[in-house]
């Protein structure tokens, strides 16, 4: 069991307005963490912050669109003007489409990868300088078991994902997938049909890459970067088909955000489900 004990004087950034993201905000706010809630839908963001304020939590809202580089720059520049450091980053951004979606498969794949992977990666890279200034920074990437390696039909692709050592290599691999989608060869090349799964697989690989990079460039920093699956929860993202509550799904992300472990045994670059590490 991992105890929530990093309580005072921490500042967290969460991409959230409802569902699991909102419940993560509640769990962090309840232990005294200042929350900077960011999301694209301003109306939902303002409503979420009002609810959190009513609970007595220290929270502020900022608008950001992860599919827009200028929006990411405005947000991170604004943070740098007002905060010396950021202690926790929870990446909870994610879009998915209904089975009867009228957009083409190409359009869906492009939109999902743009937000769930490329946008999240660029946002994380932009905010890393502030995280590095914290005493014991944490990044939590909220992923999915739908993004485990087993979704790939090609052993070569599995090996390429696990051996990626730079974000540039990973970007190239994800762009290969999009190219295969556009020319209708993704199936024969070993890619799955589930573009949401590919976006989360890429996020899991990004987690490992960033964890290794930060451990190598900032040894002794106690910078922990992990990914997790909240499980199949009853949220807007899956059209309320999940069996778990959003509150239950927020448990593991909140646990990772508040990890107190230090030293060589502290988990970083790992994937968690039900509060425990599993293979990705």
Where are these regions (language model features)?
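Catalytic loop of short-chain dehydrogenase/reductase
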Residues: 95, 102-110, 132-220, 229-230, ...
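Conserved glycine-rich Rossmann-like NAD(P)H-binding loop of the short-chain dehydrogenase/reductase
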Residues: 31-47
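The beta1-alpha1 cofactor-binding region of Rossmann-like NAD(H)/NADP(H)-dependent oxidoreductases
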Residues: 42-43, 63-74, 106
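Hydrophobic positions on the long internal alpha-helix
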Residues: 90, 123-127, 131, 203-207, ...
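C-terminal helical subdomain
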Residues: 227-235, 239-280
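Canonical Rossmann dinucleotide-binding motif of NAD(H)/NADP(H)-dependent dehydrogenases/reductases
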Residues: 1-36
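Active-site Tyr-X3-Lys motif and surrounding loop/helix of classical short-chain dehydrogenase/reductase
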Residues: 74-77, 81, 97-114
